[in-house]
A protein has these predicted regions:
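Function-dense linear segments that define catalytic or interfacial modules
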Residues: 1-103, 108, 113-119, 123, ...
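Internal maturation/activation junctions in enzymes
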Residues: 53-100, 104, 126-206
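Glycine-rich phosphate/pyrophosphate-binding beta-alpha loops
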Residues: 204, 215-220
């Protein structure tokens, strides 16, 4: 647990555990986009393309944090110019200062997936079967490895999140498990440069987004194929 980043609550849907004043930032990758020869016996999942997309998405999410901070600065400037007395505005100013500080110190992201149920169907795998469970585990492995590897690359380019401390997290079961899967030069870069984001991934219900992608939501199966 990093200083100032204890878990105190979640976002409304519960997929991201948040520290005080932290933000819920979500982005989803549509898994159906990576199925080759969908609905056929030779259907496959393009893990290489998926991994590259995850890396780009993680980089985009980090850019979004900078945009968030920029907008917070604009809001604070607007509040400063408001005609109300300083004593009245102070509560709001303190709130935005705390939100800004949390954004800068942790740079939390919530990268996930949607369309898992449809992806499995397109591959000819029954939801809940041993084969589908193995495929799902591989998808999440690629999501985590590529997301955290890109976060290391971003730390090399832009700097680690300020609260990062290698001594505190080098034996963390989750983080060390991911780092152990990386190539040696990435492990060395991690120890030297750290990570850009305090946390990277999550699994959201994805209800609204999946209406746009016209896929099953998040990791859920199709509940009914047709309605009357």
């Amino acid at each position: 647990e990093s200083v100032g980043f204890g878990s105190t609550s979640t976002n409304p849907c519960g997929e991201i555990i948040l520290s005080p004043y932290d933000s819920c930032r979500l982005m989803l990758v549509n898994l159906t986009s990576f199925v080759k020869n969908a609905w056929k016996d030779n259907a496959t999942f393009d893990f290489g393309k998926f991994g590259l997309t995850v890396r780009k998405a993680q980089r985009l999410m980090d850019d979004m944090i900078d945009l968030e901070i920029e907008q917070i600065d604009k809001i604070m400037h607007k509040v400063e110019l408001d005609p109300e007395p300083d004593a009245v505005k102070q509560i709001e100013m303190d709130l935005w200062k705390n939100i800004r500080k949390a954004a800068i110190n942790g740079r939390r992201t919530g990268l996930g997936i949607t369309g898992l149920g449809d992806m499995l169907a397109m591959l000819g795998q029954r939801y809940g079967s041993d084969e589908s469970i193995y495929t799902t585990e591989e998808v999440y492995k690629w999501l985590s490895l590529n997301s955290y590897e890109e976060s290391i690359q971003l730390a090399k380019e832009r700097g680690a999140f300020p609260a990062w401390d290698h001594k505190k997290e080098k034996d963390h079961p989750f983080i060390s498990g991911i780092i152990s899967e990386l190539l040696e030069h990435r492990k060395e870069e991690y120890a030297r440069y750290g990570r850009r984001n305090i946390a990277n991934t999550t699994t959201a219900p994805a209800g609204s987004v999946s209406v746009l992608t016209q896929t099953t939501s998040g990791i859920e199966p199709s509940f009914m194929l047709h309605y009357t």
